[in-house]
């Protein structure tokens, strides 16, 4: 895969990260174990820039794995709405907000924005596995949802940007 220009804006970085998550979730486990994370497969890496999408994706996957709540029914609803051509982005946002609030209620030490990112990642992973035909559309919704949420953006930027986000 050829290298893209380095993502400079928050929006470009988010798009790059979500696209890389999508690719990562679509990669069979046998291939994922053998891939070269620092090589030419990095669509958004660069020699003169500290943005390493493979590290960020790894951290987000770890973060998503921390969510062990029930999301099957919610994810299936997102899939159905997306397939039906309805407002999937609205349903996704409402679902992520609701699941994140529930998780934070169960664990008062959890920061809402961290829960929001974890739930978003976990829902995307579920959609990729259960309905790969709508995964790209849901990934676009996730990108828009993160980019359009001021609190999430400020949380990530407050950490020093995507490259400093800890799992």
Swiss-Prot record:
It comes from the Eukaryota. InterPro entries: Bcl-2-like_sf, BCL2L15. Transmembrane segments: none annotated. Signal peptide: none annotated. One of its GO terms (biological process) is regulation of apoptotic process. Gene3D superfamilies: Blc2-like (1.10.437.10). GO terms for cellular component: cytosol; nucleus. This is Bcl-2-like protein 15. It comes from Mus musculus (Mouse). The lineage of its organism: Eukaryota, Metazoa, Chordata, Craniata, Vertebrata.
């Amino acid at each position: 895969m050829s290298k893209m220009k380095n993502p400079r804006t928050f929006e470009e970085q988010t798009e790059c990260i979500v696209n890389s998550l999508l690719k990562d979730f679509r990669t069979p486990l046998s291939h994922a174990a053998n891939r070269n994370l620092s090589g030419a497969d990095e669509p958004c890496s660069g020699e003169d820039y500290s943005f390493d999408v493979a590290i960020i994706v790894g951290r987000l996957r770890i973060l998503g794995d921390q969510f062990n709540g029930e999301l099957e029914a919610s994810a299936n609803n997102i899939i159905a709405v997306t397939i039906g051509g309805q407002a999937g982005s609205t349903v996704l946002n409402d679902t992520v907000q609701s699941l994140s609030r529930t998780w934070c209620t169960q664990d008062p030490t959890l920061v809402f924005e961290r829960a929001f990112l974890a739930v978003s990642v976990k829902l995307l992973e579920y959609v990729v596995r259960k309905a790969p035909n709508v995964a790209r559309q849901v990934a676009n919704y996730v990108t828009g949802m993160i980019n359009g949420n001021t609190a999430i953006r400020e949380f990530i930027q407050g950490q020093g940007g995507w490259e400093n986000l800890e799992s």
